[in-house]
């Protein structure tokens, strides 16, 4: 979309940065609304890149080795994009929203390490998953929240 202005949803392609494996993002309509459905406005503020699992893994491993900083796979994508795409006079900020231990198997295999899992994350990961099926209705959602 960013290159052509044409939105072509497609099946997701699985990668080690699984939150970025979205071929038909549910929030795309919100982005269009924010930018008045203008491709020109969107592409003036937003750019995009794609990386293979090998590139993501290389970034994660090399950053750990050279900077002693442990990225998660999603952070590795953002960090690589900033490293490759910023102009010399630009400053970038890379924020991660997940602890690398959430991707322990992947991170351990790429770094040769053993990521420690923080107690709060362990308790969350070991906790019981709770879900409730409901219709895609605001009224039903609101009623559920008011009951709980």
What are these regions (language model features)?
Residues 1-148:
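PLP-dependent amino-acid enzyme catalytic core
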């Amino acid at each position: 979309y960013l290159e052509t202005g044409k939105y072509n949803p497609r099946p997701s392609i699985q990668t080690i940065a699984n939150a970025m494996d979205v071929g038909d993002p549910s929030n795309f309509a919100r982005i269009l609304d924010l930018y008045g459905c203008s491709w020109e406005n969107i592409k003036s503020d937003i750019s995009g890149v794609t990386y293979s699992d090998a590139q993501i893994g290389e970034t994660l491993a090399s950053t750990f080795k050279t900077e002693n900083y442990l990225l998660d796979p999603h952070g590795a994508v953002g960090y690589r994009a900033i490293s490759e795409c910023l102009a010399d006079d630009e400053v970038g900020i890379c924020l991660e929203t997940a602890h690398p231990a959430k991707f322990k198997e992947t991170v351990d295999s790429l770094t040769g390490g053993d990521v420690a899992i923080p107690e709060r994350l362990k308790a969350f990961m070991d906790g019981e998953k709770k879900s409730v099926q409901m219709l895609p209705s605001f009224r039903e959602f609101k009623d559920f929240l008011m009951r709980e």
